[in-house]
Amino acid sequence: MTILREIGIIARALDSMANIEFRHVDLAKGQYLYLVRIVENPGIIQEELSDLLKVDRSTVARSVKKLESKGLIERRSAAGNLKNKELFATDTGKKLYPFILAEHTYSEQQALTGFSKEDAQLLEDMLAKVRQNITDDWELVKKGQKRNYGDV
């Protein structure tokens, strides 16, 4: 089966193009993903961002630090919980959001060229199911447990 290889190729190609196209706004190496989620989820904390994007906390911490140093996001102490820092896009970060969404919309339209609306919806539903299946294993491994490959 080569389904995950195909998904990986598509994801890497889209990410590579986005990274090139976002260079002129000083976004590098997937930082646009973090900025979009922070704009869409004002007050999100890093752990929630990690879960949302399915990346480890240290990767989130590095990207958040870079976005903050560029003035695109800011951290604020959460009300009643000084340990958690809520993340918010600055006005500068919010101004990039429509541009990033335009790239996303264009890429999705290109990727789905030749698909009927029904086929596109079916693909979205199937990929959501794949994501949920992977999420279960991701949660398991994230907690230090091992997956069982015994019946593969």
Summary of predicted features, one role per range:
Residues 1-25, 141, 152:
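N-terminal leader segment of winged-helix/HTH proteins
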Residues 8, 36-40, 101:
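Short, locally clustered residues in the helix-turn-helix/winged-helix DNA-binding domain
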Residues 13, 17, 33-36, 95, ...:
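Pre-recognition alpha-helix immediately N-terminal to the DNA-recognition helix
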Residues 41-45:
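Short capping segments at the starts of secondary-structure elements
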Residues 46-47, 58, 65, 85:
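Residues within helix-turn-helix
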Residues 50:
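The alpha-helix within a helix-turn-helix
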Residues 65-128:
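Charged, amphipathic alpha-helical coiled-coil/dimerization segments
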Residues 117-152:
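C-terminal regulatory/oligomerization modules of transcriptional regulators
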